[in-house]
Regions:
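Membrane-interface helix-loop junctions in multi-pass transporters/channels
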Residues: 1-132
Length: 132
């Protein structure tokens, strides 16, 4: 993982600077507050997947938006640790329906990222092009 996205992403990594740390921090606070207000990890995770799909699918790539929204906001909104805890709890109880529900949530998250990237592409195509 690079500071701006997964390996091979279109977002070039930036050298860490105080400005970038502040972008991540400023994005993290509203993300964490929204997660707390929602009180629903699956909804928070799906919303975060949709948003990071939009940000990562933007053209041209926007490294600062990825720091603020992708890493800061979505990173604190979503919860991999909570998802794994729910999975382990369901498995410990022998709840196949609980495990199936969590796997469904995982698939929905992937679809939300794909949808977000598609929305970003549509938004990019609908913007008027500047002539040089």
């Amino acid at each position: 993982m690079t500071p701006c996205g997964p390996e091979g992403s279109r977002v070039a990594p930036l050298p860490p600077r105080p400005e970038e740390l502040l972008l991540v921090a400023f994005g993290a606070v509203p993300g964490a507050l929204l997660r707390w207000l929602l009180q629903a990890d699956p909804l928070a995770n799906l919303l975060g997947c949709l948003v990071i799909g939009i940000v990562s699918g933007s053209e041209p790539p926007r490294p600062r938006a990825m720091l603020l929204v992708g890493i800061g906001f979505c990173g604190s909104l979503t919860t991999f640790s909570g998802w794994i805890l729910a999975l382990e709890t369901a498995m410990g109880r022998g709840s196949l329906s609980g495990v199936a529900l969590l796997l469904l949530e995982l698939a929905a998250g992937v679809l939300a990222v794909v949808l977000g990237r598609g929305l970003a592409g549509r938004l990019a195509r609908s913007r008027p092009r500047l002539r040089r």
